[in-house]
A protein has these predicted regions:
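A residue-level marker of the well-folded mature domains of exported/periplasmic proteins
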Residues: 4, 20-224
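Bacterial N-terminal signal peptides
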Residues: 8-16
């Protein structure tokens, strides 16, 4: 939820910067569909921020769109460009598929704020995210200590995107310090409880002994 609050703050700063140069401001906000608790919070805070700003300044127009897939989000951003937006706030559904369209927005001179999952190229003016490498390092050190620095583990990754890579890479880097800890398998569960459950069941059938499992999670949803 802290990232949602940061998103509201970024929009606030963005509006302030435009207020001196444009009588009418159009801001597009593109985020994933509220398909679980964390994205539900993102949607709620985005709607709240929009309502509050429009009550204070009728010259600010927001276009909030949600997408259940990268393809839908690309189409949404294209539609926002047609609407003539001055700025785009985007939480990418997936980093790689969204980078080209966001780069197009950026090259058109539209102010871009990227939130959380990031893009594969620096094609934003502002990037807001948590300490994802830190999350990977802390979880790796904790797990190593709990295992007494030896054992076999499996990993459930998130969606293949920038923040997932940052967390997993940092986790793996710490693991190198402990050669007696072996990573048996690491697969993307796409931050889905159901998908994670399926992969974990396969892990349990495939490997004779698993001492621990690492889940790269989005927020506070239950791990498989």
């Amino acid at each position: 939820m802290k990232k949602a609050l940061l998103m509201v703050l970024v929009v606030t700063l963005l509006l302030s910067s435009f207020a001196f140069s444009a009588p009418k401001i159009r801001i597009g906000v593109s985020i994933p569909t509220a398909d679980h608790g964390w994205t539900g919070g993102i949607n709620w805070w985005a709607q709240k921020a929009i309502k509050e700003w429009q009550a204070k300044d009728p010259d600010v127009t927001f276009f909030l769109v949600t997408a259940d897939s990268p393809a839908k989000q690309v189409a949404d951003v294209e539609d926002l460009m047609v609407k003539g937006i001055d700025a785009l706030v985007i939480l990418a559904h997936d980093s790689a598929p969204l980078t080209p369209i966001v780069e197009k927005v950026y090259n058109e001179g539209i102010f871009v704020v990227s939130v959380d999952r990031g893009l594969t190229k620096p094609v934003e003016h502002v990037y807001v995210a948590g300490d994802n490498p830190g999350l990977g390092r802390v979880s790796a050190e904790w797990m190593a200590k709990e295992l007494n620095y030896k054992g076999s583990i499996v990993v459930l990754e998130g969606i293949p995107c920038v923040i997932n890579s940052e967390r997993v890479d940092a986790f793996n880097e710490v693991k190198k310090k402990y050669p007696n800890i072996k990573i048996l398998d690491s697969q993307p569960a796409y931050w889905s409880t159901q998908k994670g459950l399926e992969i974990m069941e396969n892990y349990l059938q495939k490997y004779d002994k698993i001492d621990a499992g690492k889940a790269v999670r989005r927020g506070r949803e239950p791990a498989p």
